[in-house]
């Protein structure tokens, strides 16, 4: 979001998460011309409740509140039903995650008629990924045939929960996740050091050199075979460090 704000020379304020990676409704009770946040959060994977979202909406009746639900299909409760109650809510979702359609750059925005009409007014000026006919048709088929997507999501969720358990057994701190990744750190290993060691072995995870999260790694949930290779590396690495 800051990238686009900078691109269009918009003033903005980032809401800083607390030590537990949580947002607070009070953070949004200040003058603004719009609000956007991801739910589940990236990169933490944490989820805020529908009650939280409703409080933000009620506190900002004159502002559009955009909830980015890129990862919502991996265990979260969507706030889409709230668009019928709150005219200032817009929910955006992508086909790049749960529907495995990343190359198409396809997404949807859901809101009341007036809010969406304003998007139509400006979309050709700001949307750098116009949707071609073939992409539209594939997207429609994907929505009408969601069973395969749901089954894949359940598989990811099952592997994610196993991954959380396994990492905790290895001594990692693992916050709850409602996405297709986990956000982890080891209290006795530097985050960047572990990131580089994994990369050297061809295991790619994400690391950010930013305050509060610089000791954490974001690990995407892969196939069972990929995750077992990841666990095997960690066990060997921790053994070498004398931490197992």
Task: Please provide the spans of the model-predicted regions.
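Active-site phosphate-binding strand-loop segment of PLP-dependent enzymes
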Residues: 13-73
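Short acidic/glycine-enriched loop/turn segments that link adjacent beta-strands
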Residues: 103, 178, 212-215
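Short beta->alpha connector loops at strand-helix junctions that form conserved
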Residues: 14-19, 93, 208-209
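Substrate-binding/gating loop at the entrance of the active-site cleft, primarily
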Residues: 1-10
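Conserved PLP-binding catalytic core of the aspartate aminotransferase-like
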Residues: 157, 169-201, 217
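PLP-dependent aminotransferase class I/II
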Residues: 88-168, 172-175
């Amino acid at each position: 979001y800051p990238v686009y704000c900078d691109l269009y020379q918009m003033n903005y304020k980032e809401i800083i998460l607390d030590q537990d990676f949580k947002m607070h409704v009070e953070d949004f009770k200040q003058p603004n011309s719009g609000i956007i946040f991801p739910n589940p959060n990236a990169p933490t994977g944490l989820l805020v409740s529908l009650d939280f979202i409703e409080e933000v909406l009620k506190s900002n009746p004159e502002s559009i509140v955009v909830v980015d639900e890129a990862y919502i299909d991996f265990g979260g409760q969507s706030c889409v039903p709230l668009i019928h109650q709150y005219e200032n809510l817009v929910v955006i979702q992508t086909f790049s995650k749960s529907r495995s359609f990343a190359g198409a750059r396809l997404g949807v925005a859901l809101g009341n008629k007036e809010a969406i009409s304003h998007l139509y007014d400006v979309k050709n000026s700001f949307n750098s990924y116009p949707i071609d006919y073939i992409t539209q048709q594939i997207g429609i088929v994907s929505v009408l045939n969601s069973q395969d997507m749901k089954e894949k999501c359940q598989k990811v969720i099952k592997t994610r929960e196993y991954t959380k358990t396994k990492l905790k057994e290895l001594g990692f701190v693992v916050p709850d996740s409602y996405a297709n990744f986990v956000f982890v750190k080891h209290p006795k290993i530097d985050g960047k050091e572990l990131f580089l060691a994994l990369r050297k072995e061809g295991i790619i995870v994400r690391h950010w050199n930013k305050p509060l999260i610089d000791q954490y790694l974001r690990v995407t949930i892969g196939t069972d075979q990929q995750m077992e290779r990841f666990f095997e590396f960690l066990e060997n690495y921790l053994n070498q460090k004398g931490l197992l």
